[in-house]
Amino acid sequence: MVEDSSNPYYRVLFSELRRRGHIEGKTLAVDRYGQEQMGSGMPSLFEAVVKNKPDVIYAIAAAAFIKTVAATVPVVALSGDPIAMGLVKSLARPGGNITGMSVDVGPLLHGKRIELLREAFPAMSDLIYVNLRTSWDAFLGLAMRDAAEKAGTRLLPSLVDSPASEEDYCRAIVESARVGGNAIMLGDSPSALRFRSAIVVAVAETKLPAMYTFPELVEAGGLMAYSFDLKDLNRRAAENIDAILRGTHPGDIPYYQATTFRLSINLTTAKALGITFPPSILGRADQVIE
């Protein structure tokens, strides 16, 4: 998570912080923690995060971790439903030490992705789902299973262990396509964005249609993506971080609920797969790559 990251959402975050006067190395110090620090488990990660007594934590993490660190440090979280997860009392007045942005990562969002993929490829019956094992074993996996069942789609999970590498993703995609499935869906993990070029190439080798989370994978040659506006969410994260650094209590900052979703499609990739997007998809696409 750096300002010159290949991840466009992190660039937006730091650009907005800079615009508000928080410049890393000058007026802002940033400690970074991720999959690499999870080797010894959640307690050791918690200890590492809070030992330097940060003024605020930006967390894209499990609810248990967010709750634990919030007992000590104000948190801006990018999460699912914070009320259902027990993070806050209400969206309008969180009331505790946590605020942030809520995104629907439940059955409705996954169901919409399945629906759109089926509109593009009506023959879809068996869906290969590629994501981190940790996500599959948690709320995301439950939501995906629920969505697939409601859509009458057989789900074939192909799971990648954390920390995931580019090779892990490519192997999971290619090997799962060999054993069955006639369409692919990539999960919401940021690591899929980091390895987007290799992932798109691996999917292309399978000659199967695929639904992605991030539009950047469609720009890299993927077929289609449907998700919330992550650039907007990271701008809002920077706004919340700025407010907390200037003295506002997180419990007084409303928890934002994302309502904007974007559909991206790649006509060149569709043509290569022999797919013609129906008017129902063409008419609602926010981004069309030709």
Regions flagged by a language model, labelled:
Residues 1-290:
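Short hydrophobic alpha-helices and adjacent helix-cap/hinge residues
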